[in-house]
Amino acid sequence: MLSMSKAVKARAHTWYTIDMEKGVFRFNKRLCPRCGSVMAYHKEPVPRWHCGKCGYTIFESQAPRQRPSRGR
């Protein structure tokens, strides 16, 4: 349980970008295509988006590694 001495930081305002000229706001995070929940971004060990509710994972594409030639 949280003690009263610890302050809880509000993070919800970082999830949106507001464009005042157009009068629109945009959600910065990804939504899960399977269940619709908000997905978390993980940098380590492999960059990916992961849904904690259903387990769906989207791996970010990386530059393909070149295989060494076999000398044939």
UniProtKB/Swiss-Prot annotation:
Gene3D superfamilies: 6.20.50.180. Keywords: Metal-binding, Ribonucleoprotein, Ribosomal protein, Zinc, Zinc-finger. GO terms for biological process: translation. One of its GO terms (cellular component) is ribosome. A zinc finger (C4-type) spans 32-54. Binds 1 zinc ion per subunit. It comes from the Archaea. GO terms for molecular function: structural constituent of ribosome; zinc ion binding. SUPFAM superfamilies: Zn-binding ribosomal proteins (SSF57829). Its cofactor is Zn(2+). Pfam families: Ribosomal_S27. Zn(2+) binds at residues 32, 35, 51, 54. Part of the 30S ribosomal subunit. Belongs to the eukaryotic ribosomal protein eS31 family. This is Small ribosomal subunit protein eS31. It comes from Caldivirga maquilingensis (strain ATCC 700844 / DSM 13496 / JCM 10307 / IC-167).
